[in-house]
Amino acid sequence: MYFLKKIVNLFSSKIESEDNNVKKDDLTQPRKQSPEARKRRNRRIIFWLIILLIIGTIIGVIIYFSVRKEYDNVIVKSAQTEVVNNKKVLYLNTIRPNSTQITRYTIDEDQLLTARVNILNNTNFQIISNASSLGLSRISFNIVREGVEKFKLGETNIYAPISGNTNNQWNWLTSIITQNAGIPSSGFNPQVIISPLISIIFFIIFLYIILRVSKAQSDSLLGTNKANAKLTKSGVRFSDVAGIAEVKEELIEIVDFLKEPKKYVAAGARIPKGVMLYGPPGTGKTLIAKAVAGEANVPFFQTTGSSFEDTFVGVGARRVRELFEKARKSAPAIIFIDEIDSVAKKRGNSLTAVQDQTINQLLSELDGFDTSSGVIVMAATNRLDTLDDAILRPGRFDRQISVNLPDILEREQILRIHSRNKNLSAKVSLEDIARRTAGFSGAQLENVLNEAALLSVRDKATSIHMNHLDEAIDRVIAGPSRPNKVISEREREQVSYHEAGHALIGLYSPGADVVQKITIVARGRAAGYTLQTPERNENILQNKTELISRVRTALGGRAAEELIYGPNEITTGAANDFYKITNIVRAMVASFGMTDVGLTQYIATEGVDNPYRNSYSEQTALAIDIEIEKIIQREYKIVKEMINEHREELELIVQTLLELETILKPQIDYIHQYKQLPPEVIANKNKREASQKQANSSVEEAKVVDDEESIKDKEKDQKSN
């Protein structure tokens, strides 16, 4: 029992160490098992030990009875025959090795024939009979076949009567017994103990492997063995992040706490347990979290909200627990959950309670943090309005930091950071690039420089020039160009009028963005596009005049097509324009309260649980639709009037586009200011007309020569006739 108790304690400590990972008197460690759980675990261990002992005993018994007996070789001292009661008897005087004991064995003539027959048939000879009438002791031999002409002699009570005199057989058996004789061993056979022990050991190993494999398969089926967080050491610093100075200021305090937590604990300060970063995609939320971990030089656990969920119920909550346990052991550390809205949306909207379980576990872990644990949770989302209110309350994600799209100065700083390892030409102006990339995120700006570098390599240039950056911006906005796309001259002209209509309205609408570029080069699914950027720094708020200007600019393309080609020749090129127009006007009517429908917000701009569920009546929906259509038709009429009023300028823009295919702001401003074609367009047009005139004159000269030769040929024919 003492030995069994020791084994139980050994297994208990092993399992407890695996369950609890480490034992420390630390509040950040998981709780110890309850006494009831410990008793249940000990009972399971004792049960399996008893099962193993029973199985080992059964295997040992089977091996004991299946192992052939060992025989000690005996040395035959003499072998002689005598006649006793008219029977021949063989006397064997033998001695064991390493022993002086002499044993006398007897065998009579009656055994010989049967023994001979059984030996030849490869069978054991064992026939019991009564030989007391011979006056001999009840001793005979069991001859067991060991191999060709080799036999062992063992003790049995065997006699075999036989009739007749068989001297030849007698002599044969005498020689065989003399050459090979043996009796059962009286020593200890170690196989009786060793074999069961070996069997038990192999069985335990086999059982361990089976349990491990089955557990791995079960975990794989449940998806619980999938790593849900990457532990890394971040090498990013705040100097690697540009354009978010106010965000850095908010996070410096977090970095200081991770470096010197005792200072804040001693002062009784409660550092925010969670930091929520929200903003548009590509603004650098993940990069900021890495910079915080890099500045504080602490482990960085990175995961996504979707990695917590799986097919089976309870897996998400388990992964949340495991992630926070790992972070506690590595404290001070940072947990970063990207796209947290996929796991922490408002509760009650999901079809099942699986997601609610994960949210509840996440809330519990955030509340369970000790203020001195040294673990900071950072999360990122593009939709703060969809998150559960309990996530954002003080004590969980206390600090909510907005990471917006960079303005022109911040874009220039981002471009400078990403151009550190780029060989830019001295003529490249990053300020100009920043001005032309309004609305670009940090990720898009990095992509612009990378595309420009690839284009420079393709052109075998030693540095990145402005034309490479122009093409890179176009690629990011509309995709790569399609120079090999076959387009008719009429379609090319109609695309020019469409884009010129956008640009013309942008030039004359108050509050409209500045027209930076117009192109009719096909890119992606677009036959052309017009690039506009804000005249001033980007504003967070937009007024009604600016929204109306965006609507008019988008309507300019269709209006120009209809005025030039008629209502029956309009194209599908305005589909995306109408999509933008409808969204802007619908927001003005139903969200911003900018029309006669009223100041009520019928369509929420944030926290929409179900976008297909209306919170207003059918009459209100009809009023909204009527107001939207009224505004669009009113603005469309104004746009057509503006195009008719500035028809001459529209034609100049179209001629320039047909000549150059892509025109930039200086050329657009020249046309708008002087109402004439830019000098380079005139020069290019004159050059093309001159080359065409020269080609036509060459054709005329060739035609004259051909006519003269034909006249001469006719004259020759007439003379010959």
Swiss-Prot record:
It is found in: Cell membrane. Residues 66-190 are extracellular. ATP binds at residues 279-286. It is a multi-pass membrane protein. Residues 700-721 have a biased composition (Basic and acidic residues). One of its GO terms (cellular component) is plasma membrane. Zn(2+) binds at residues 498, 502, 577. Its EC number is 3.4.24.-. Its cofactor is Zn(2+). Pfam families: AAA, AAA_lid_3, Peptidase_M41. It comes from the Bacteria. Acts as a processive, ATP-dependent zinc metallopeptidase for both cytoplasmic and membrane proteins. Plays a role in the quality control of integral membrane proteins. This is ATP-dependent zinc metalloprotease FtsH.
